[in-house]
Amino acid sequence: MSAEDFAIYASYQINAGGLFVGTLKVIRKTDGRMLFPFQGAPVLGPYPSRQEARDAAATHGELIVKSDIANPES
């Protein structure tokens, strides 16, 4: 399994306080399993800029992919 076997969708949204929160969806393409978000998943932020929120979400997504490659979740 490689990083190409995953789809990472990283974006952001604005919270009620006007700050930016990262949004993330990570899907394992081989079986369609959504690895993130999950029940109780952490909130990614808030951050002062949309770019920081998006970058944090993308970085978290890459970490999830690396972790799943090393130790696949069934």
Predicted regions and their residues:
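Intrinsically disordered, low-complexity regions
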Residues: 1-4, 31, 35, 60, ...
